[in-house]
Amino acid sequence: MELVFIRHGFSEWNAKNLFTGWRDVNLTERGVEEAKTAGKKLLDKGYEFDIAFTSVLTRAIKTCNIVLEESHQLWIPQVKNWRLNERHYGALQGLDKKATAEQYGDEQVHIWRRSYDISPPDLDPQDPNSAHNDRRYANIPSDVVPNAENLKLTLERALPFWEDQIAPAMLSGKRVLVVAHGNSLRALAKHIIGISDAEIMDFEIPTGQPLVLKLDDKLNYVEHYYL
């Protein structure tokens, strides 16, 4: 069976080189075109889906809608869940990446961005931009809502959604599309493929390009490739 991952199209803060994380930003025109191209590729290759999973962030939701519209499948059920959100970049969210490197040093910022188990500084829960003050997370216990994450923590919160929603859907015979974010998809790919903690640091998923993971009937990894 096949599972298709798509990272959201190029966003406004991708274009501005800002740390985004859980901040809710829109797609750029480039991002919209990337999503349209992805949908057309899926249509041309004959990919049909029974259900789509995405995050609760606008850039992923819009990408999912565009992909499904272009592939003539906008009618299928979509499940939105915070566990597919991007990695939470803590106090770095909204900061310019280059300026942050100049302030803290390239090495420190590299550790925050690329280390598997070291998180950036926490975002104050009282900050106006904190997820604690966003009603889309109102039903999540406050001690579960992150203030900063590394990739390890991103996997730990995404994995229950894989086990409770995505994997059962696939095992029941449903054809699944997941439209999410660079780090939430990298985290799930690490689990599915069996990528080591060291190797995952160099595993990148480009914006708007369908990544196909081939699995056997027990969801064991076989191979992966881009369309």
From Swiss-Prot:
Name this polypeptide is given: 2,3-bisphosphoglycerate-dependent phosphoglycerate mutase
Site residues, Transition state stabilizer: 181
Gene name per UniProt: gpmA
The enzyme's E.C. designation: 5.4.2.11
Alphabetical list of InterPro entries matching this protein: His_Pase_superF_clade-1, His_PPase_superfam, Phosphogly_mut1
Record GO biological process: gluconeogenesis; glycolytic process
PANTHER family membership: PHOSPHOGLYCERATE MUTASE
Binding residues for substrate: 7-14, 20-21, 59, 86-89, 97, 113-114, 182-183
Active site positions, chain numbering: 8, 86
Catalytic activity entry: (2R)-2-phosphoglycerate = (2R)-3-phosphoglycerate
Subunit structure as annotated in this protein's UniProt entry: Homodimer.
Pathway: Carbohydrate degradation; glycolysis; pyruvate from D-glyceraldehyde 3-phosphate: step 3/5
